């Protein structure tokens, strides 16, 4: 179990993390989210013992990581985004070396982790020859070598192809049945797929901590409509959309070129569950907008993340 209690971290006069508190029990996979510069990485580094809090306390299974760092760190496995592996070593030799460093029996632990992390096909290869997906598997085996109770993963599927992503996620799900797991990622769909709970940090503060469905219900909208229109003056488009009854928020999602067309994607959220598509479509046609697509969007963690990490929301939480 991890208990983070009123933790802050200063870098000179700058407060990167400000009075953050949460706890994570065994057997839970939690997503740690936040925009760049929000304090997410600093929080992870304090939990893993790489940084000491300026204020507050972090307990690892009841042990203060600041006063008993060695004992606490024995319970933590950490997989950084770009793990420093020895490329010239054969996978099997590398894992035996890591086992010996942890005082584990290589004859027992290496075959066990080879099976758990799906490394059978690459055990005789040099690490430098491995795909990114297999390097991630080796990094995960490294993090699990001393059988930690807590596993912290930083961007575990970043840069992987879809098949590799699903393979790594399956491993993490299995690991999470018996361990506390924190997944830090910018891929919001990954948190929805892997995690039952999300902790969101913005502006150095905790802005949300709840299970994902509750977050969607509390901070999302019951109904959203996504529009794909020809590129146009967004400010005028937004004003026109807001004339439609029951529209709550309007947000430009992207501007791209698709099949030779320059298009803009706009997400329109609705108060309640009122059907606005007929009126919205009529307005767009009458105003001579080029409407290519209109579809209903389910609430997503991306909508929640956007709502909680905008400057206005963050300031309101201070």
Model-derived features: where do they sit?
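Conserved protein kinase catalytic domain
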Residues: 73, 114, 169, 216, ...
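C-terminal coupling/interaction segments
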Residues: 269-318
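Hydrophobic/anchoring residues in structured secondary elements
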Residues: 9, 34, 249-255, 296
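ABC transporter nucleotide-binding domain
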Residues: 170-183, 187-269
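ABC transporter nucleotide-binding domains
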Residues: 2-4, 9-202, 206-208
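Positions that flank functional sites
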Residues: 114, 129, 256-257, 299
């Amino acid at each position: 179990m991890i208990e983070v209690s009123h933790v802050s971290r200063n870098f000179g006069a700058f407060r990167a993390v400000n009075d953050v508190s949460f706890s994570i029990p065994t057997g839970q996979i939690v997503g740690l989210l936040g925009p760049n510069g929000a304090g997410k990485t600093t929080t992870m580094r304090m939990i893993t013992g790489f940084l000491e809090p300026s204020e507050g306390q972090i307990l690892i299974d009841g042990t203060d990581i600041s006063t008993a760092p060695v004992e606490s760190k024995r319970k933590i496995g950490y997989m950084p985004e770009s793990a420093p592996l020895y490329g010239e070593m054969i996978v099997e030799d590398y894992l035996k070396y890591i086992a010996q460093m942890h005082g584990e029996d290589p004859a027992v632990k290496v075959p066990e982790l080879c099976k758990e992390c799906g490394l059978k096909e690459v055990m005789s290869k040099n690490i430098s020859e491995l795909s990114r997906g297999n390097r991630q598997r080796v990094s995960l085996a490294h993090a699990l070598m001393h059988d930690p109770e807590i596993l912290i993963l930083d961007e575990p599927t970043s840069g992987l192809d879809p098949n590799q992503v699903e393979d790594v996620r399956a491993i993490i799900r299995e690991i999470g049945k018996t361990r506390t797991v924190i997944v830090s990622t910018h891929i919001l769909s990954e948190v929805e797929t892997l995690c039952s709970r999300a902790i969101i940090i913005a502006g150095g503060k905790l802005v949300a901590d709840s299970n994902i469905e509750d977050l969607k219900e509390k901070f999302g909208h019951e109904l959203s409509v996504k529009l794909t229109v020809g590129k146009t003056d967004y400010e005028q488009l937004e004003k026109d959309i807001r004339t439609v009854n029951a529209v709550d928020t309007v947000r430009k999602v992207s501007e791209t070129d698709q099949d030779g067309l320059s298009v803009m994607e706009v997400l329109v959220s609705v108060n309640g569950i009122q059907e606005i598509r007929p009126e919205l479509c009529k307005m767009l046609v009458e105003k001579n907008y080029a409407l290519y697509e209109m579809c209903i969007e389910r609430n997503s963690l991306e909508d929640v993340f956007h709502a909680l990490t905008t400057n206005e929301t963050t300031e309101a939480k201070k």
